[in-house]
């Protein structure tokens, strides 16, 4: 048996099913050693720890209501019933996935410490959460955003930043980290260090090249300096870019919430719409898995569906007659 855990903040009251059943409060202590492991050894955040506690409290409450006082002894069939009950209670697929993930981690920990012979949660799968389609700017909106006046304070920087964002589809972190040495403006290329330390070469469009040249002349940037420096002299912060893009969108008369990743989404969507080359878009974005890139095919289909609805004679809806 694991040693008793140090006290962990109580979150039992935060789940509707956490205290279901007569023995829920008594058996909640069974997961305290696991929570202590998360807190001390894995050093998870307080937010994550609270989520684990709520999810496991829900399992304990459900098991207690079924007459099972020891959750360590539940089998896969019982866990499947728990997932079904939570789904019927109205829990979203995303929340179910998180709840089942907490159960898997708990049973894996029990297995590692010899409390159980096999994990009843290993093979269980929650319903898939529908992927939310990314919001994008259409081509006209993108042009309106990037063509900010260059005679305003920091106008040259803002123009270069927006042009590069939309031209090359960089992640926010990648753009903030760029130094002038990473740019080959003569060849129209930028070398990007992406997730996992993976390097990729991305084209830079002619409008972005012109804007970057103007900004470099104005700022006196050298090879070692950041393309977009912050006030303290290092790289500009991601938060500063988020705030600035939001401000610029408002100034350009745009009424939707514009954020940095929207420019990356727009880049990917517009390239895919024009080329149809999903693999090429994957490489440009630096996605390790093409499944991540495939979300943009749904956006392209949405566009095609609108074109179809507007143009096809058999798709046009008849106006209701009185």
Curated annotation (Swiss-Prot):
It comes from the Bacteria. The keyword Zinc does not apply. Residues 1-25 are annotated as: Disordered. Residues 132-309 form the Tyr recombinase domain. The active site is at 171, 195, 261, 264, 287, 296 (o-(3'-phospho-dna)-tyrosine intermediate). Residues 16-25 have a biased composition (Low complexity). Keywords: Cell cycle, Cell division, Chromosome partition, Cytoplasm, DNA integration, DNA recombination, DNA-binding. Residues 25-111 form the Core-binding (CB) domain. GO terms for molecular function: DNA binding; tyrosine-based site-specific recombinase activity. One of its GO terms (cellular component) is Holliday junction resolvase complex. Its main location: cytoplasm. GO terms for biological process: cell division; chromosome segregation; DNA recombination; DNA transposition; resolution of DNA recombination intermediates. The keyword Cytoplasm applies. It holds the Pfam family Phage_int_SAM_1. It is found in: Cytoplasm. Belongs to the 'phage' integrase family. XerC subfamily. Forms a cyclic heterotetrameric complex composed of two molecules of XerC and two molecules of XerD. Site-specific tyrosine recombinase, which acts by catalyzing the cutting and rejoining of the recombining DNA molecules. The XerC-XerD complex is essential to convert dimers of the bacterial chromosome into monomers to permit their segregation at cell division. It also contributes to the segregational stability of plasmids. This is Tyrosine recombinase XerC. It comes from Xanthomonas campestris pv. campestris (strain ATCC 33913 / DSM 3586 / NCPPB 528 / LMG 568 / P 25). The lineage of its organism: Bacteria, Pseudomonadati, Pseudomonadota, Gammaproteobacteria, Lysobacterales.
